[in-house]
């Protein structure tokens, strides 16, 4: 019965596709200078076209939500809509761009997401079995390991801003619990070695901090 069952996909018309693209909001998740235009593929490295990517990235560099329609209008004389959509799709596939909810949707879920995230960060002080934080921006869950969650607490509650301070903060939590870092499959026993490894991880956390902030995980 064709009134109940339809064979194959019911595809959107080009006008519907364009309309839905225009309504979508997007947000860059990495600092502008950290986004490279080299793409690793099965066939080797591919250089992305700077004449398309650079103007889009410049508009997204503030790490704030932007409607695709806004980007399209701003780039009307430089980037065609189909090329803009391709740029956004590639950045999203590289996890450098998020599809975000509108402001009303974010406000509706923000308090619950933040309460959940605070519970998880507090739990991370003694237990690292759940590596998940919720983003009010996207409405989704993002994998965040135990140590980044611990660093988040040091950054938020203690205003620790450099890798050495964050490493000391994490070590003061891990050491009394008898927990040690590992390097090359070996458990590190010396305090200096543990702190050295924690500093490396803290530096990686600070590099990721703009992403966490854009997703409202911190």
Residue ranges and their predicted role:
Residues 1-61, 65-218:
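Rossmann-like AdoMet/SAM-dependent catalytic core
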